């Protein structure tokens, strides 16, 4: 009979009977009793009263019985810690049993019993098991170290288990090596600063050897570990890729994705001119396609990962479009993901095929899917210019179907096509106007109103069409009301004599009859513009619109690089970095792809420009989503856009609505979402000019870098500027805020001094930052633990992170801040020193330095004289290193000391420097090279500040 009989009993009050059976002299009866206890425990009955009786059954040679008792112990030890001590002697004895299965079982169970009192007894048995002659015991003990570290990290370090664990890299058994990697990875994840996975070339060879011989899950641990390694050059990267490539044909999809992750990372270091690079691209496609033959649920994970891969390297799957065509029985989440990938892969070569598919999808019965398909046609028109006419024709065919939701979605996307290709397809406006009465969705109505307002001079009855919307003005959504207001103002500016009454009517409705502050504010702005300077109003309202982006939802490049490093994990499914959804200390390590070598630099993937900055001199681009129309005071009404960030407003605060997206969180009872909200400051398209070159670049003589000796400085802490008054009391109703920025041990802080110069007590403090160039945001709420009495001063260190919303500011290091207390909300702006963003891993390899310096165009080089600096070479190098500006190499030429230095910003931008120091001369010559020239001027200021203080 099977063991299912133990779960079918309906007896009550059997604890006493079980107790008697557990103390029976007959082994079989004991085993039966323990099975009954485990069955009761499994279905939720409390059998903890039997703890001492079950523990007595541990003294047995029967492996099955011992496993059952250990299972019981793991479940009840936490609730009965004092009783669990009874089992320690048996554990210690079992760890020396001749049977390796029992030794491993004992050490595994001891690791699973999370009771502090037992951990100290675990140390000696664990030490022996780590050096056991049997590999099964060693591999079990390796995992036990990670479990023990989770319970008591200090004990593990004091007992030297981490060193023993590291030594297992040389173990002859691949499973032991794999478990060693898994354990160290687990520990390193919870302690990012421990540097446990300090991999070297020799260790990598051992891991690659073990990779071929261990189980599939062990292979995943090893591949993930390989992904954390940084090869010293492209040759080593290619060697690793060659040995990892066979994993692509593995039957386990997790192994395949882990292998893809490693290859995607190391491809960054390979030259595109290599034959091997092209071969690797071809090898990556088939395994990814194979993953899509699974059931819908396991198919969704590869699809989400492929979405990332095609954003980074579309060439991998450019010939596999048909694989992503939707099947009739695909669930909606698979359909939508495939649709998104199809658009990303759309090109002039396959657009006809894609459009035919999308048109077919638009006739299906699933409303959500049909909407997405129609929107996809519009995205194709914007992405592939040659297909725009065909896309518009397809959309008109769909409008002729008169299916309401199809018509409405088509009008929304045609609005975007008009933005992308002005004065090209306006002939279809008449057809759109025929469907005006059938529009009942806010987005479609707003789109139609925008079209009528934008092309009012071409529509004879534009005033009648817009007037028809005014009848139910107060019943419309905010989106439609705002759009109608702007459209009628546009109409008035184009036909002033005929529409004066209409514009007065809408301004009156917006400013006098509306409770919506956004609508009211926009109405007043238009009213003042029109009444004071109609010419200026025309220039503002009818200004030429910026281009909309070809890709509205591409992930920001630095985030994409980070997500590529998390392929095969939950982060790649969420499309969010781990720190965005993992609480506590785990998952906070920021990963990024290695910097591309000079030979591998891609024209279509330039090295990260500063957050929010265009890579070249292109017109400002804004996303085509929601109601983003380029008009004055455009507000965030839809979901956040993940396209290119908007240009920032200037430092002058003026009437900026700083908290246009975050006021709710600041004014509520609790300051939730601190540092997260999207601010709604109106963008002004201000392009940052590259700093002027101050002289011809000095010949750097970098070809001899390989023979140079590194300059080594002493870490003495980053320079901290003295506190300055950021918000005077007279501007903040008695609240004075002074502060400075610091960076210590990899953490950025805003050190604040709050002084109450008012006559009333201040409480309920909260702080919020506007979107800024580097994503600076509070990492925790502003904690003022006691009310701030009159004339009292409090010092606070506010931790910051760089995972906030990004928007390019002018100047680049401008930070706009809102502070709220029980009196009011106050705004100020300050400039943070760029050196607080210099990260600790900013020392570039010499070969990489040489290749990158040569690869960065000469026009990106900025040169500057630092005067009145009395430091010698060693002191200067040491001082700069304390602020994370690292000396890669040093040489002396014609009596001049030349320091070659590198630094890296938090968003992954590298800056290379050549500092020339003439002994006895207080003037230094600094040459900087960076792929983002606008960063250089601020780096020069950082150099000068650090060296002179």
UniProtKB/Swiss-Prot annotation:
GO process annotations (BP): clathrin coat assembly; determination of left/right symmetry; heart development; intracellular protein transport; kidney development; vesicle-mediated transport
Top-level taxon: Eukaryota
Pfam families assigned to the protein according to its UniProt record, in alphabetical order: Adaptin_N, Alpha_adaptinC2, B2-adapt-app_C
First and last residue of the signal peptide: none
Alphabetically ordered keywords of this record: Acetylation, Cytoplasmic vesicle, Golgi apparatus, Membrane, Nitration, Protein transport, Transport
A GO cellular component annotation in the UniProt record: clathrin coat
GO MF assignments: clathrin binding; protein kinase binding; protein serine/threonine kinase binding
InterPro entries: AP_beta, AP_complex_bsu_1_2_4, ARM-like, ARM-type_fold, B-adaptin_app_sub_C, Clathrin/coatomer_adapt-like_N, Clathrin_a/b/g-adaptin_app_Ig, Clathrin_app_Ig-like_sf
Modification N6-acetyllysine occurs at: 318
Membrane topology: Peripheral membrane protein
Post-translational modification summary for this protein: The N-terminus is blocked.
Similarity comment: Belongs to the adaptor complexes large subunit family.
PANTHER family in the record: ADAPTOR COMPLEX SUBUNIT BETA FAMILY MEMBER (PTHR11134)
Official protein name in the record: AP-1 complex subunit beta-1
Organism (species): Rattus norvegicus
Gene name of this polypeptide: Ap1b1
């Amino acid at each position: 009979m099977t063991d299912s009989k133990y779960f079918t009993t309906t007896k009550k009050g059997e604890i006493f009977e079980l107790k008697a059976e557990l103390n029976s002299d007959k082994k079989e009866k004991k085993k039966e009793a323990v099975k009954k206890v485990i069955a009761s425990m499994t279905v939720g009955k409390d059998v903890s009263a039997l703890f001492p009786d079950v523990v007595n059954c541990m003294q047995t040679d029967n492996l099955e019985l011992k496993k059952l008792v250990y299972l019981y112990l793991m479940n009840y030890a936490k609730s009965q810690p004092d009783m669990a001590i009874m089992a320690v002697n048996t554990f210690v004895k079992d760890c020396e049993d001749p049977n390796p299965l029992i030794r491993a079982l004992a050490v595994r169970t001891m690791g699973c019993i999370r009771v502090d009192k037992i951990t100290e007894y675990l140390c000696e048995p664990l030490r022996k098991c780590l050096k056991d002659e049997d590999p099964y015991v060693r591999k079990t003990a390796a995992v036990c170290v990670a479990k023990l570290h989770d319970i008591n990290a200090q004990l593990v370090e004091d007992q030297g288990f981490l060193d023993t664990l590291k030594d297992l890299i040389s173990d002859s058994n691949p499973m032991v090596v794999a478990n060693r990697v898994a354990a160290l990875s687990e520990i390193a994840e919870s302690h990012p600063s421990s540097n446990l996975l300090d991999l070297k070339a020799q260790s990598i060879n051992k891991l690659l050897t073990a990779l071929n011989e261990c189980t599939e899950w062990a292979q995943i641990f090893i591949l993930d570990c390989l992904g954390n390694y940084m090869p010293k050059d492209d040759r080593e990267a290619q060697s690793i890729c060659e040995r990892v490539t066979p994993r692509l044909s593995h039957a386990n999809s997790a192994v395949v994705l882990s292998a893809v992750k490693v290859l995607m990372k190391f491809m960054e270091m390979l030259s595109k001119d290599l034959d091997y690079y092209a071969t690797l691209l071809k090898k990556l496609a088939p395994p990814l396609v194979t993953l899509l033959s699974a059931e819908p649920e396991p198919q969704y994970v590869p699809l989400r990962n492929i979405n990332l891969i095609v954003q980074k390297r579309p060439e991998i799957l450019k010939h596999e479009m048909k694989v992503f065509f939707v099947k009739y029985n695909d669930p909606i989440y698979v359909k939508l993901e495939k649709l998104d990938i199809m658009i990303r892969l759309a090109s002039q070569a396959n657009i006809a095929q894609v459009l035919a598919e999308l048109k077919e999808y638009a006739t299906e019965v699933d409303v959500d899917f049909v909407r997405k398909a129609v929107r996809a046609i519009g995205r194709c028109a914007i992405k592939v210019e040659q297909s725009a006419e065909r896309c518009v024709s397809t959309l008109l065919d769909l409008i002729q179907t008169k299916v309401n939701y199809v018509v409405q979605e088509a009008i929304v996307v045609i609005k975007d096509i008009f933005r992308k290709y002005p004065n090209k397809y306006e002939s279809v406006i008449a057809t759109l106007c025929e469907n005006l009465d059938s529009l009942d969705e806010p987005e479609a109505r707003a789109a139609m109103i925008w079209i009528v307002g934008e092309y009012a001079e071409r529509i004879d009855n534009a005033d009648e069409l817009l007037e028809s919307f005014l009848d139910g003005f107060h019943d419309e959504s905010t989106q439609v009301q705002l759009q109608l207001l702007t459209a009628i103002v546009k109409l008035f500016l184009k036909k002033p004599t005929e529409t004066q009454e209409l514009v007065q009517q809408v301004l009156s409705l917006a400013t006098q009859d509306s409770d919506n502050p956004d609508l009211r504010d926009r109405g007043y702005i238009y009213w003042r513009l029109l009444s004071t300077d109609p010419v200026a109003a025309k220039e503002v309202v009818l200004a030429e619109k910026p281009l909309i982006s070809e890709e509205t939802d591409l992930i920001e490049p630095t985030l994409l690089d980070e997500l590529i490093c998390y392929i095969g994990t939950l982060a790649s499914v969420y499309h969010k970095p781990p720190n965005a959804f993992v609480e506590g200390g785990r998952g906070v390590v920021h990963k990024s792809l290695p910097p591309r070598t000079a030979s591998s630099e891609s024209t279509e993937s330039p090295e990260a420009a500063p957050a929010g900055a265009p890579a070249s001199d292109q017109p400002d681009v804004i996303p085509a989503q929601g109601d983003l129309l380029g008009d004055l005071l455009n507000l965030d009404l839809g979901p956040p856009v993940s396209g290119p960030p908007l240009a920032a407003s200037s430092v002058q605060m003026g009437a900026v609505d700083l908290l246009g997206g975050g006021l709710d969180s600041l004014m509520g009872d609790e300051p939730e979402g601190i540092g997260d909200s999207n601010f709604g400051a109106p963008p002004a398209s201000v392009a940052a000019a590259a700093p002027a070159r101050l002289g011809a670049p000095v010949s750097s003589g970098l070809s001899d870098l390989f023979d140079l000796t590194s300059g080594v400085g002493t870490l003495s802490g980053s320079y901290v500027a003295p506190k300055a008054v950021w918000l005077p009391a007279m501007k903040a109703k008695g609240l004075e805020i002074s502060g400075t920025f610091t960076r210590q041990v990899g953490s950025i802080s805003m050190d604040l001094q709050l002084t109450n110069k008012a006559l009333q007590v201040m409480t309920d403090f909260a702080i919020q930052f506007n979107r800024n160039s580097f994503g600076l945001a509070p990492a925790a709420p502003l904690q003022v633990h006691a009310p701030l009495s009159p004339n009292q001063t409090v010092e606070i260190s506010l931790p910051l992170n760089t995972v906030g919303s990004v928007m390019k500011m002018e100047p680049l290091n401008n930070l706009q801040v809102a502070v709220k207390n029980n009196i009011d909300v106050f705004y100020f702006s300050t400039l943070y020193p760029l050196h607080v963003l210099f990260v600790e891993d900013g020392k570039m390899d010499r070969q990489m330095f040489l290749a990158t310096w040569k690869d960065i165009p000469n026009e990106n080089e900025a040169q500057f004289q630092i005067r009145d600096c009395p430091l010698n070479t060693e002191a200067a190098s040491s001082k700069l290193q304390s602020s994370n500006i690292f000396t890669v190499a040093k040489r002396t030429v014609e009596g001049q000391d030349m320091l070659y230095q590198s630094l890296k910003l938090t968003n992954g931008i590298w800056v290379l420097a050549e500092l020339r120091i003439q002994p006895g001369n207080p003037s230094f010559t600094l040459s900087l090279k960076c792929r983002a020239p606008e960063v250089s001027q601020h780096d020069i200021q950082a150099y000068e500040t650090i060296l002179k203080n």
